[in-house]
Amino acid sequence: MPPMLWLLLHFAAPALGFYFSISCPSGKQCQQALLSGNDILLYCNSSGAHWYYLFTQGKKGRLTSLTNISNMEIMPEGSLLIKDPLPSQTGLYHCWNKNGRQVVQYEIDFQDVTTLHITHKDLGQRPLQNETLHLGSKQLIFTWWEPWQDCNRCEEPGECKRLGYRYIEEPLEEAMPCWLYLGEVLVWSSRLRPELQVEACHVQCTNNTQLRVDYVIFDNFRLDEKTEFVWLDCPLGSMYRPVNWRANDTPLTWESQLSGQDFTTFLDPSTGGRQLQVFQPAVYKCFVQQELVAQFKPAASLETLEAQWRENDAQWREARKALRGRADSVLKGLKLVLLVVTVLALLGALLKCIHPSPGRRSTQVLVVK
């Protein structure tokens, strides 16, 4: 992606204003599976809060004050923003208020989004099956599905998606997100993968899902000369929100991509379609929660500018010819009017000589020889 476009896009999202967040009741401990590579806000309503963490993968450690991790930021109101989280950052996150009392505790499993298994129900594609793991006793590996997200379009056919996380359950115990359960145990399985499932939808429009934000226009994207493609990034788009792209007002769908019908664009599964790879110039629009948030116009190429200049020059020449023709017609018309006025003036003078004005008597002289 061109540096300037990347910069604009990444400054646009904070300006527009919010990240997807999860919350936990004050004083409680909450367990949650999420996806790596997708920004998340861990809510803690305590101004001046301090955060402590313990990553559970790798060697044992202890709670450490969160001060210098590059992709984490404590927000003014106390919440913790984690940008592009890594699978290795799976672990415990504690929020303490400025008086040294724990406010909330999160146990987060950042499951590896690069191994995402994506399926479309309308194409007959099947999600991952359950599997048995043997670690001293039998553990069941299964997918825990989140509710379906809202349809990404309304009043016309759209698509909706849902996320699935791999959980492990053993007899008489509650199920846990797999990597929180495994901790330091190194296990490989082709079924220890998060899932994304898509299906068609058709709903009426409501105001309940709208973001109510102004949209942004970017009008200078170019395809890379070497790779011949560019990545577009939809502000406010997220794996956790419904996203929809259109190319010249034609919807881009997961169904077309997963069935191999569309090779001009590529919706990135690891971002839930927030990022779009394009291989040809067009006007691209992205919608989040059914609302337009950004429009991308291609920068004009040198050939296009030259063609436009030639077209404008030809139009100017034609306009000048037409103007010159109209000017000649007007001049001829003026000459004709002037001739008519002159003739009428002469006729008027002649009539005055032939018929004197009433009330004035003429002197007549009779000559007799």
Curated annotation (Swiss-Prot):
Its main location: membrane. Keywords: Glycoprotein, Membrane, Signal, Transmembrane, Transmembrane helix. The keyword DNA-binding does not apply. Glycans are attached at N45, N68, N130. The chain crosses the membrane at residues 336-356. It is a single-pass type I membrane protein. It comes from the Eukaryota. InterPro entries: FAM187A/B (IPR039311), Ig-like_dom_sf (IPR036179), Ig-like_fold (IPR013783). Residues 1-17 form the signal peptide. One of its GO terms (cellular component) is membrane. Belongs to the FAM187 family. This is Protein FAM187B. It comes from Homo sapiens (Human). The gene is FAM187B.
